């Protein structure tokens, strides 16, 4: 007797993000083994990331060099200025997004700039630039909108500004650390005066004897909810009362975990995210309990991530938190991989839903005051806002985990694959399928037709059969079907498409198969 065709469904495929850490046979169907150039969209579907368009039309004196840092100065009157560095120079974007080089305006001999790995911080309408081995610099638009100077050349300068590699602006002052000669002292400026380092309420905090896990060095600083976080390589110190530095005190410590990359630290409304020696971590503040439990966001991709980090120059690792996009991005540039950690919702074990991007090639990031996301590129600043990488398509890939279709002792005979997709227009989706952990996939193509704007309710495919929302962007839904063939005990399917101007998400997958021989 002929076996009946059975249908196996995956609703909200890829909802849990990547999992390359655990055995693929033990994974929930919501995990992905490949999710390249993907995000988890606002409805919990695996979907295409956005691309980028150029903010500046020409490079000016930046030339074909990387934009290593981007910073936004927000002044009291609401004036916004985008500052950036590359080619051992400092630039700003004009009101028409023209690249304008800032020249030295201090009146003496111009400082020698040999790198562009600045950490920027703004205080009282002035942006400060700190970088190891360099004189700290300032851009003060109240004095000049076309020049920079040394901090030491500002009127009212007092004491010696530390030649630090780390600087943040918090609680109305600058905090700096890790000079060429001292790596265990935090220096803080006077209130509202980033050029005053000895009088008023300025001072320093030596933590050399405070480290609880042996000698360490400061690798980063962060501030949150009145607390100052001092990151070492293998430990973290948490100081309370940082609004009044003279009386602040140690509140908590985290041992065995620290920060290994200065520019991986990002503060959100509730967390401080950073790259540790074992992955991306989140310090969850519970102010009432004065505790700081840590959480491993990269648990499901830890080995892959840390393998990538091992081959990096740590100062080249950059990150950003985007409140609008609800993700934390971390780039490992040597392998051209951007790790996207979704922050809309975490998995039950505290891990984040992770996807990767492989062709956008960020050199730096900026999340602007208005929520827009800027990306440092070679010769340009990119704006994350379109579904092309500067007029070029990019390929989205999603592959399921390996799974038996009901009985691991029975061979499955594939008959048909279908995918419900939302978005896309006039583009090919390549279906791939393979058996028993082999990568010699079979494939077939289905085409999303040219389509206009429609409105669809998506409750039919919502998790737990509940209404998630309406796709208010008016993007059409299509069911794509291909005939499949081949047999195996364990099946994996994949879905690839070139993104070229239109968003694409996968809402549901169905696999039709017959049972074969018992083995």
What is the meaning of each model-derived region?
Residues 228-254:
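Surface-exposed extracellular loop regions of Gram-negative outer-membrane beta-barrel proteins
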Residues 140-169:
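Asp-box/WD-like beta-propeller blade repeats and closely related beta-sheet repeat scaffolds
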Residues 167-199, 204, 212-216:
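Solenoidal tandem-repeat scaffolds enriched in leucines and small polar residues
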Residues 90, 136-137, 183-185, 236, ...:
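Structural signal for beta-propeller blades
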Residues 106-110, 154-157, 196-213, 294-311:
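Surface-exposed loop and turn segments in beta-propeller and other repeat-based domains
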């Amino acid at each position: 007797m002929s076996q009946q065709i059975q249908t196996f469904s995956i609703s909200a495929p890829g909802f849990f993000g990547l999992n390359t850490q655990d055995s693929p046979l033990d994974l929930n169907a919501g995990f992905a083994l490949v999710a390249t150039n993907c995000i988890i969209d606002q409805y919990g579907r695996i979907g295409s990331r956005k691309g980028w368009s150029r903010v500046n039309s020409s490079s000016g004196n930046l030339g074909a060099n990387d934009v290593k840092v981007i910073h936004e100065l927000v002044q009291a009157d609401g004036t916004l200025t985008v500052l950036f560095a590359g080619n051992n120079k400092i630039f700003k974007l004009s009101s028409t997004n023209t690249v304008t080089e800032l020249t030295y305006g201090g009146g003496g001999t111009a400082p020698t700039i040999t790198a562009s790995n600045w950490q920027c911080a703004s205080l009282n309408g002035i942006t400060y630039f700190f970088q190891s081995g360099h004189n700290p610099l300032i851009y003060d638009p109240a004095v000049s909108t076309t020049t920079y100077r040394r901090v030491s050349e500002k009127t009212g300068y007092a004491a010696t500004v530390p030649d630090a590699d780390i600087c943040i602006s918090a609680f109305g002052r600058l905090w700096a650390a890790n000079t060429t000669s001292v790596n265990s002292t935090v220096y803080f400026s006077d209130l509202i005066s980033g050029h005053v380092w000895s009088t008023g309420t300025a001072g320093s905090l030596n933590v050399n004897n405070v480290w609880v896990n042996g000698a360490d060095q400061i690798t980063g600083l962060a501030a949150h909810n009145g607390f100052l976080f001092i990151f070492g390589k293998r430990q973290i110190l948490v100081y309370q009362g940082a609004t009044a530095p003279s009386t602040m005190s140690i509140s908590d410590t985290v041992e065995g975990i620290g920060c290994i990359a200065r520019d991986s630290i990002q503060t959100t409304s509730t967390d401080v995210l950073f790259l540790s020696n074992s992955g991306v971590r989140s310090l969850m503040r519970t102010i009432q309990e004065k505790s700081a439990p840590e959480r491993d966001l990269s648990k499901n991709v830890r080995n892959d991530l840390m393998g990538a980090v091992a081959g990096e120059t740590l100062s080249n690792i950059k990150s950003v938190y985007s409140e609008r996009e609800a993700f934390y991005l971390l780039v490992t540039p040597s392998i051209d991989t951007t790790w996207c950690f979704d922050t809309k919702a975490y998995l039950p074990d505290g891990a984040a839903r992770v996807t990767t991007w492989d062709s956008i090639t960020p050199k730096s990031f900026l999340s602007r005051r208005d929520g827009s996301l800027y990306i440092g590129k070679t010769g340009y600043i990119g704006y994350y806002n379109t579904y092309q990488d500067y007029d070029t398509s990019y390929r989205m890939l999603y592959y399921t985990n390996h799974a038996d279709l009901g009985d691991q002792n029975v061979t499955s005979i594939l008959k048909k694959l279908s995918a419900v997709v939302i978005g896309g227009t006039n583009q090919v989706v390549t279906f791939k399928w393979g058996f028993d952990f082999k990568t010699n996939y079979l494939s077939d193509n289905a085409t999303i037709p040219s389509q206009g704007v429609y409105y669809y309710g998506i409750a039919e495919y919502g998790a737990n059969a509940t209404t998630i929302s309406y796709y208010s962007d008016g993007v059409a839904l299509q069911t794509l079907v291909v005939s499949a063939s081949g047999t195996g005990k364990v099946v994996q399917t994949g879905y690839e498409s070139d993104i070229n101007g239109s968003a694409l998400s996968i809402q549901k997958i169905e696999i039709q198969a017959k049972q074969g021989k018992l083995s």
